Amino acid sequence: MGGRYRWLIIVGAVVALQWVAAPAAAQWIVSPEGQQRQFDRVRLSATYWKGGLEGRIDLGDIEGLPVILDVRDMLGITASEGGYIFEANLGAGRRHRFLFLYGDRKHSGFNVVDIDVTVGGAPIHAEVPIASNIDLRQARFSYNFLFVARPEVEIGLIGGVGWFETIASVDTSLGAATGELRTPYPSFGGNLLINPAGRLRLYAEICGFPEVNVEEFSGWLADFQVRGEFFIIDNLGVLAGYRWYQMDFRLEESDPAFDLKWNGFFFGAQARF
């Protein structure tokens, strides 16, 4: 009797498993693209970013004189030497993802500034060459919750922490000055992924935080990107888009203040698994 019941249980389990699994298996065979894309576990991308830089850098007083540099007019920086951005998107189930970003972008410029001063009642005109360098490094780790997770569209909220380092150096015949700013920051925002057709995808993301004033820290940050992705084969593709990044920070009254805006186009490659 026990053996008979054992076989009945086994047969019943097999029938139940087929009844549950068969529709899912059939759906996977009929539409593998939608099923697989909804559950991408890993997305990796590497992009090259080039564009302009605008803004001001307040280095404070140097030898009793305030030094405020306009990065375009005074420093002669109108375009970047280029930079790179690495991004990783790791899935943990249908609605939970973890995002990691690291980027480095360098700018350099050269300009000749006309200076008119009066010494002993006599006007003196001088031309001062200025060589400058600005380096931005950024890292960010975030949690992404998708409150809409469908094969054709994903919409989510992003929350995390980031870190950036900005170094500005100016070298002239009258002297040199360097300003550095390193700080962690909170990051909040959202993202949107649309799959309009086949291997083509559209992605938009905005992160940052509004104006805050906490103890000796004040500032705000915004990081926005929009891009298109096309997968040549199922797991490898290319992408191109536009990124806009602006920050305004000061840690202490004696530290340099940065009001900078990066923008420009980027292109690169992406893999998904």
For the regions a protein language model found, what residue spans apply to each?
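Short glycine/proline- and aromatic-enriched beta-strand/turn motifs that initiate or cap beta-hairpins
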Residues: 26-105, 264-273
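Repeated loop/turn-to-beta-strand initiation elements of outer-membrane beta-barrel proteins
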Residues: 95-98, 151-153, 198-202, 234-238
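Cleavable N-terminal export/targeting peptides
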Residues: 1-38
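Short, loop-centered acidic/histidine patches that primarily coordinate divalent metals
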Residues: 207, 231-233, 241-245
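Residues on the lipid-exposed face of transmembrane beta-strands in outer-membrane beta-barrel proteins
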Residues: 46, 86-92, 141-145, 159-163, ...
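Hydrophobic, lipid-facing positions within transmembrane beta-strands of outer-membrane proteins
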Residues: 42, 82-86, 137-141, 155, ...
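Detector for outer-membrane/organellar transmembrane beta-barrel domains
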Residues: 154-156, 163-164, 175-211
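Extracellular/periplasm-exposed beta-strand and loop segments of Gram-negative cell-envelope proteins
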Residues: 54-82, 104-137, 163-183, 211-217, ...
